[in-house]
UniProtKB/Swiss-Prot annotation:
Source organism, top-level taxon: Archaea
Descriptive protein name: Large ribosomal subunit protein uL30
Organism this protein belongs to: Methanosarcina mazei (strain ATCC BAA-159 / DSM 3647 / Goe1 / Go1 / JCM 11833 / OCM 88) (Methanosarcina frisia)
Encoding gene per record: rpl30
PANTHER family: 60S RIBOSOMAL PROTEIN L7, LARGE RIBOSOMAL SUBUNIT PROTEIN UL30
Database matches in HAMAP family: Ribosomal_uL30_A
GO cellular component: cytosolic large ribosomal subunit
SUPFAM superfamilies given in the database record: Ribosomal protein L30p/L7e
UniProt-listed NCBIfam families: PRK06049.1 (NF004711), uL30_arch (TIGR01309)
Length: 153
């Protein structure tokens, strides 16, 4: 499962890239979505790689984001009780592990908003104009996306 975080704004962005961002539901800076690994999403993420940070997320980080930033319709927080009552899982951590393994989907939680609004990272970005290979934060982080998401919790 991919975590994709928008890091750059929409000024001077080509229409096709902005359209792809809308399809991914990344309308604003510091918004995050979780996507399954398939060729369709992989191509879309590859197209917007110069405006986002992405990588493979682990269960611990997914549970942390769901607990801290998960919102239901009406801007209510996602709680352990809500997960227990509305899914087959006992906790957010168990649900996150099932999602990462592919046994469950975020759509299994009724009324869960698909976009997670994150804080800017603590201690700042390494630079939003450069890729990870050049010392910035844009592009494919692979497993290190978990560090960025922890900073943005």
């Amino acid at each position: 499962m991919y975590a994709v975080v928008r890091l750059r704004g929409q000024v001077n962005v080509r229409y096709t890239i902005e359209d792809t961002m809308k399809m991914l539901r990344l309308h604003k800076v510091n918004h995050c979505v979780f996507l399954p690994e398939n060729p369709h999403y992989k191509g879309m993420v590859q197209k917007v790689k110069d405006y986002v940070a992405y990588g493979k997320i682990d269960a611990k980080t997914l549970a942390e984001v769901l607990e801290n930033r998960g919102r239901l319709e009406g801007d209510a927080r996602l709680t352990e009780e809500y997960i227990r009552e509305n899914t087959d899982y006992d906790s957010i951590k168990a649900f996150a592990e099932a999602v990462v393994e592919g046994k469950a989907s975020l759509k299994d939680v009724p009324k869960l908003k698909p976009v997670f609004r994150l804080h800017p990272p603590r201690k700042g970005h390494a630079g939003i104009k450069r890729t990870v290979q050049q010392g910035g934060v844009l592009g494919n982080h692979e497993e290190n996306i978990n560090v960025l998401l922890h900073k943005m919790r």
